[in-house]
Amino acid sequence: MSDYKSTLNLPETEFPMRGNLANREPEMLKSWNEKGLYQQIRESRKDSKPFILHDGPPYANGDIHIGHSVNKILKDIIIKSKTMSGFDAPYIPGWDCHGLPIELKVEQKVGKPGHKVTASEFRQKCREYAAKQVDGQRDDFIRLGVFADWQNPYLTMDYNTEANIVRSLSKVIDSGHLHKGVKPVHWCTDCGSALAEAEVEYEDKMSPAIDVAFTAVDKPALLAKFGLTEYAHPISMVIWTTTPWTLPANRALSVAGQLEYTLVEMVKDGQTQALVLAQELVESCVERFGAETHKVLANVLGSELELLRFNHPFYDFDVPVILGEHVTVESGTGVVHTAPGHGQDDFVVGQKYGLEVANPVGDNGVYKADTEIFAGQHVFKANKAVVALLEEKGALLNHVAINHSYPHCWRHKTPIIFRATPQWFISMDQKGLRTQALSEIEKTQWIPDWGQSRIEKMVENRPDWCISRQRTWGVPITLFVHRETEELHPDSVSLMERVANRIEQEGIQAWWDLDAAELLGDEAEQYRKVTDTLDVWYDSGSTFSSVVASRPEFNGHEVDLYLEGSDQHRGWFMSSLMISTAMNGKAPYKQVLTHGFTVDGKGRKMSKSVGNVIAPQHVTNKLGADILRLWVAATDYSGEMTVSDEILKRSADAYRRIRNTARFLLANINGFNPETDMVAVEDMVALDRWVVRRAAALQQELLEAYDQYNFHLVTQKLMQFCSVELGSFYLDIIKDRQYTAKDDSNARRSCQSALYLISEAMVRWIAPVLSFTADEIWKLLPGERGEFVFTETWYEGLQSVTLDSDLSDEFWEQLLTVRAEVNKVIENARREKQIGGSLEAEIMLFADEALSTALSTLGDELRFVLLTSKTDVVALSEAPADAIETELASLKLGLKKSEAEKCERCWHHREEVGQVAEHPTLCTRCVTNIEGEGETRQFA
């Protein structure tokens, strides 16, 4: 054989079998950065049609987690695929930099503002901390192979962005959407200040649990709802609460509209009365109340009770029944005492019904001087007094002490309260914001489409948006309020622009340093500066204006796509929609895509305590970013995204299949010059024409899947092509022709031309997903080309190929099926040691007339398709009794070991081996390929 080895066209490539991605990728990143790849891409798409994906900013605190990776990789795949489609798709990454988590981190280091450090110094420390966090996260995102303008990201703490956030608020105000109101917040009476969620800890606490009766104002109206006409005894609706001190602020009774409520008669201590209770809780309630006897009088849906009125148990006013989604039957009575000034759920439902937000409690936890009966008492100490008064009024049905989980201040470890405080709101209804936002939702494409109904329900039900916070590190609400009337300064909008100009130069500290007289002159004494800061959701929600509208890369274009996790319907998608609609009367986006959360192999959330966290840094350091990227692309993001070491291992296996396909392609176009060696499609061998046609059809499917953001379909179709059409069929068949044909023959160049065309197309197909691997392949492809695949567009060399009428797509599909059946028979023969390899086999195909006609089309070249040394097509009717059945009714098979000599060069067993005296170990085909014109192939 050694004599003939040099006559073979053996595959050769510098593209290694092993990706070694973890080591090789950082080198590529360095090269991309040094060569300004992102700017090269921008330059290549200058003046092209824009596609704007606006980056929802992650919070600048802590390391990135797997969810961050999913998000950034999905965005990157879209940006790259849109770029390949010819769009100018800049990507400006952003970070959310203000807010409580950063304050808490800085507090741990330097203490609270106003103690060891001034508020100004504290803000500077927050700015420095956020900048450091951004640097760490940026490095991790870059490592994922995400292309972006990493040197010029947007930060919500950039001076110009802070200024633009203020300008955005001025437009919202100018449009008439701002109003001042009150809202309950966590309040520590020891701190004398509001607490954020992160500052609240839950500890066990003993509290009084009481059942309280509210008597009916209009008995006949209530009875009518239950289908009754008269009843001689008192009727009450009963609430259960563990915070008796909030009863002075009661303004309603909440029931669940969809629950059944029962009017139950109870006799206790000789007294008869009827009570309204949730049907499911009647038995537990009457037992708790110590009833001697009870009977059900009637039932009705909670929704029927809406707006009936009941008397407050100790004040001289009555309150309505309202419907609340927060009402459950887990405990209590199924009726919830509602004090909008002392609870978030109460406040939200109270907003819907326009209830007064009563706040009888001062900063120090003591009832204010105008609080009837309880003025001057501390709320927790007043519990006993409230209970005693209820008993005196005959309204107390039960009283016990319970131990339950209760919010405490994380600093003082003392119980806290919910307390209404003055806040700034964007109104949902005073200028029609809710109606307009719902209209805009309909005009937006939501992917998946259930996102539309989800955000619609949220907008329909959401209360006014409280945009103010009492924090130090945040964009200030730059308003001047009249000291007596609490009215905004009449020139607020123009004053805000002047403040914004200062912030643009000096950052948000400019507001706190500002002397009101500098802007207001003599009016300064009549006005006070607002010291509240904006909710950080306002910061990020206004970036369509504060960032997109001001960055030159976006050139004034509107945003095409927002893409975030499914929690952002309530978060960034919502805040952006509200602000944009309030400012401009329209949504800030045309499409909104959401992806699910990452969960482990058992469907559990990632949690350090469970120990199931998969850090993206660990994956890139061990397997490489391309493996992580392939997992993201291959996973259907519309639901939960499952990830585990086992799943990533499967991604690595899939990656190897793609890599091995690419390696085969590169190895077999080694030495091929597309300028001089390309065979025109019409002159190609039929099988080569077919595979180019399949690649062209696949490209259409892939481009459609990319365009519709169906990346899991991209990977599925690509894997199918690599594994089935190429791996199991085409590449297997062409090895003989590729290796043994005369090196410059049409038979071989036809094959190489097809491989080259597929390579040019495939490197582009995979570039948005397997970016590192695509770059590696690109550099090894023959022919003149640009430096990077990422500046290219989809390959246009896969022109439509017309197949011979006899050799249609259906013909080749049929051949694939026949070959699969033949392979089963050959594999079985190998297992039973009947033959060594497929080339030792001679195959008889007993086929019906239609199949026989099709197979005979290929003549002697059928053996190359079936990878056997000899094939005979025989009529099905002549099949012997021992012929092997197949899955096809039209085909039976026979196999025997060839008795012919084996050709030393091509390994086929042929009768003509040794017919040429000078080459006694070769078949005549190999002799022709070595010394003659070279064999002619027409079909395969």
From Swiss-Prot:
A motif ('KMSKS' region) lies at residues 605-609. InterPro entries: aa-tRNA-synth_I_CS, aa-tRNA-synth_Ia, Anticodon_Ile_BEm, Ile-tRNA-ligase, Ile-tRNA-ligase_type1, Ile-tRNA_ligase, M/V/L/I-tRNA-synth_anticd-bd, Rossmann-like_a/b/a_fold. It is an enzyme of class 6 (ligase). Its main location: cytoplasm. SUPFAM superfamilies: Anticodon-binding domain of a subclass of class I aminoacyl-tRNA synthetases, Nucleotidylyl transferase, ValRS/IleRS/LeuRS editing domain. L-isoleucyl-5'-AMP binds at residue 564. GO terms for biological process: isoleucyl-tRNA aminoacylation. It catalyses: tRNA(Ile) + L-isoleucine + ATP = L-isoleucyl-tRNA(Ile) + AMP + diphosphate. CDD domains: Anticodon_Ia_Ile_BEm, IleRS_core. It is found in: Cytoplasm. Binds 1 zinc ion per subunit. PROSITE patterns: AA_TRNA_LIGASE_I (PS00178). Its cofactor is Zn(2+). GO terms for cellular component: cytosol. Its EC number is 6.1.1.5. Belongs to the class-I aminoacyl-tRNA synthetase family. IleS type 1 subfamily. Catalyzes the attachment of isoleucine to tRNA(Ile). As IleRS can inadvertently accommodate and process structurally similar amino acids such as valine, to avoid such errors it has two additional distinct tRNA(Ile)-dependent editing activities. One activity is designated as 'pretransfer' editing and involves the hydrolysis of activated Val-AMP. The other activity is designated 'posttransfer' editing and involves deacylation of mischarged Val-tRNA(Ile). IleRS has two distinct active sites: one for aminoacylation and one for editing. The misactivated valine is translocated from the active site to the editing site, which sterically excludes the correctly activated isoleucine. The single editing site contains two valyl binding pockets, one specific for each substrate (Val-AMP or Val-tRNA(Ile)). This is Isoleucine--tRNA ligase. The gene is ileS.
